[in-house]
Amino acid sequence: MKITIHRGIDQIGGCITEVATSKSRILIDLGQNLPDGEGIVQDKFDNRSAIALLTAGIDAIFYTHYHGDHLGLFHLVPETINQYLGRVAKRVALCKYQRLGYIKGREDISANEINKIEHMLPFGPEQSIEIGDIRVLPYFVSHSAYDAFMFLIEANGKRILHTGDFRGHGYLSKGLLPTIKKLILKQGKIDFLITEGTMLTRLDERVRHENELKREIVELMKQYKNVFVMCSSTDMERLATFHTANKEVIGRPFVCDDFQKSVLEIFTDTAGRKSPLFNFGKPYAFWKENSKLVKWMQDKGFCMLVRATDKFDDYLAFLKPQIDRNETVLIYSMWKEYINPTGKHANKRYLDFIGKFPVIKKIHTSGHASADCLTEVCNLVNPTSGIIPIHSEHSSNFNKLPIKDELKSKIITSSKIINELKVEILIK
């Protein structure tokens, strides 16, 4: 049996992990490298010939969630290979790529992407899927993408837990440790833990719960009448934070564009059936000709979800003369480094967009596991053979976590054979 980390050691995003036996081979994630500040992606796998070579002999691909750094190369996969994505995640991904199809000159690209997503095989939590002699069991996790999963992989008497991206400080995080303890470990010990480590370079950073963010946002909404919000359009838990905060400031419409409204409707139709927190009701889709909505926004104020696009540049230019500048704020709720003008991750489009607002407030918490959460998970799982840290700028930093000394000796960041299983780490 063999585990191959094609990509993910010492880099965030672009994750590609392979699990193989003598009879079957699967990939966990087929992520595209993250773009630079200019939006340019450097990725040697971003072409059909490279993916054809990488996936030759692969029986199936499983995606932990719909973020591009985990799913982004899906459209290059040969038709003969089955691709699996969470049931709700598939709906969100389809909504996103259908919208991209409206971009002029992108019609053929989008048609292929939409076709590939439509043919993806959906799965739900704890649904056992067998690919030859490999068994895959998905378990729900909280992340900044809804319907994200960790995978328990069983083959040749070995058990591997691949966490995907996860966190312990979201509304849906309370099930993380009980799921591992009661559903995964009760079936038997884990041999190898493949885990994300995004926060390893930010070990001292305090992560805040979504509830804490909500309280801070409510206070800002009381201070400012006109509230613009820049956050991920598919981060259900963060969107719920803003939606519930806005409901506490009575009488203000929750406004977005028609794409965002479509995403919110998916969340309401799925997670909203289980918890009122994720029932987004009837958000108001903005267009300039909707004079009734514009008048309401002028009179009562609003919470409006925005993105750094030409369309929202136009909406903002339309609204600015009609609202009081002194009562207007942009709440930026994404990673701070995107708007750090001197940082290597600075996004020029984001910087240009936020520059249009008189006041900017940063309110954010990570979609990834904190150092404390990573420690808890590692100690609880307590793998018998090895820990493979991926999705981290410096995977060797895993040694700095306060995990058991016995576990520190099991951290794997280079190729080796352990208990008849070969771990191959391909250096980028």
Question: For each predicted feature, which ranges?
Answer:
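C-terminal regulatory/interaction regions
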Residues: 11, 244, 248, 282-428
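Charged helix-capping and loop-helix junction motifs
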Residues: 175-182, 208-215, 345-350
